[in-house]
Amino acid sequence: MRNRIHRKHREQCCLGVIEVKGNMSPIGLTTNVLIAHAEEFHGNTEIVGVNVKGERRRTSWGEVGARSRRLSSALVKMGLRQRDRVGTIAPNTCDHLELLYAISGFGGIAHTINPRLFPDEVVYIINHAGDKALFVDPAYVGILIGHRHLFETVENIYITGPKQNEVAARMNGFKFLVDLFETGDPAYEWPDLDEDDAAVVCYTSGTTGDPKGVLYSHKSIVVHASVVSLPDSFCLSATDTVMPVVPMFHVNAWGVPYASAMVGCRLVLPGPNLDGHSLIELMNRERVTMALAIPTIWEEVLEILRDAGASLESVKRILSGGTAVPSWMIKEFDQSHGVRLIHGWGMTETSPLGSVNSPLRKHLALDGDEKLEQMSSAGRPHWAMRLKIVDEEGTQLPNDGVSEGSLYVKGPTVVESYMSHEAPATDEDGWFDTGDVGTIDGDGFLTLTDRSKDLIKSGGEWISSILLEEIIRQHPLIHDAAVIGVNHKKWTERPIIIAQAVEDESPTETEVLSFFKDKVAKWQIPDAVVMVDELPLGSTGKPIKRVLREQYIDYLLEGNT
């Protein structure tokens, strides 16, 4: 066989320099490549979506792919261009799935917005992202009414789903997705895109209180999709029926919409009604084999199953993330329902999966408490993620399962910088400080023990203690205050206020908590107020939260509500 060498390479060879590069096709790793693959090779595989009324829409990867292309062309005809941001406020539905692919498919950036945020926060992130258009599910239209005049860049707002209340909608300046879809070209073909361009932006709570945008590139999304599909991750295949309970506005539903298109599994999208009864009925009727949700959801599901003497008829495994999973939950799913609970760790800045608890060969022989202990850790990193723990001086600590330090991560699915922030999010070597504290053992298994950043995770949602402190310190009767997260039976963690009153004042708990009204979302308001004579202060004059957490960690569990 004759060897063929590119002229450039021949010339370099003559100079004694050989440049060796791959000769593979330069097709980018982009999201429209994923949906094109699903449309062509998994076209008959069913997708089931539930709307706000509980009605089920049955479609397929073939139809979703075709509709996404047509909708993408409609967005371009509307005047949107590559790198324009397009906001979505919606639960997991077929419309939302099509929008996710349509927006990034032409080169736009899908901005999935959390409808649980306080309206002022929604306005802030829409303006910060510079969204040109918004798509909102009927379940969340109320969020936008009365705030549209505050949107600085939004030109059009569309309601998804079938037309309803058309007169009222148009009076508020809303249009309909179904009308926009009709303007699209069914013959539209996906363009070639740069895999390093942004495809999706999600916002995360920061310690300053203002949410920060994390831009996921096409390549990072495809890499993450391949990671979560692996046997030692979510173990997804074309034989599965997967239900992401975690919404798309939580880091792309943990990557499931992309991984599902990659492997061709059947997909069930549960819509906005995420109560335990609805989820159990949906999982059993649609024969779901894999589902993903936060521990609060799974605790409610277990309670209902326990009271009814029922079980999950087809589910083989579930993934739980967002907060730590108690060992009793792992045990009950396993022993009472034959369901394997997979515990994972991640964050918005890591796309989100950072580690997943998949056993090594030596763990297969474990049973009883030893098995539960192993399954309760945050797991080991996937191939695209590096972990390390460091001490206060930044020195890396050994992976011995004992040495405790701050957790840093690095990899192609880790944020490098936040949207519109000049400063990098990582150190000079590319390591990102997660704000978590923990240990790593010799096999790479991560155990989280604390959190160093001022964030509280309640029912899977982040609450900034800094934001709450900024508000309460403006109260005329409060001299100083600290907000900490404490244990909660249902929500895992809830904020409480430890406050010092102005001299000669004795504000009541009601007076303090009512100060948050119309300033933050109701679920962000602290559960209790503890008045103290004096707060423990550090050398900089700030309250020492570590001391307060140690003292009040079980305050709500002791009946102080």
Which functions belong to the PLM regions below?
Residues 96, 117, 123, 134-136, ...:
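AMP-binding/adenylate-forming catalytic core of the ANL superfamily
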Residues 338, 370-375, 395, 400, ...:
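Conserved ANL (AMP-binding/adenylate-forming) active-site segment centered on the GW(Y/F)…HTG consensus within
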Residues 288-293, 302-373, 386, 393, ...:
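Gly/Ser/Thr-rich phosphate-binding loop
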Residues 47-93, 97-101, 118-123, 177-179:
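Conserved AMP-binding/adenylate-forming core of the ANL superfamily
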Residues 381-408, 442-443, 505-509, 544:
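Conserved beta-loop-beta connector loops within the AMP-binding
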Residues 222-241, 251-289, 304-305:
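Conserved AMP-binding/adenylation subdomain of ANL enzymes
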Residues 75-80, 185-196, 201-243, 255, ...:
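Conserved adenylate-forming
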Residues 2-4, 34-35, 77-78, 105-181, ...:
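Structural core segment of the AMP-binding/adenylate-forming
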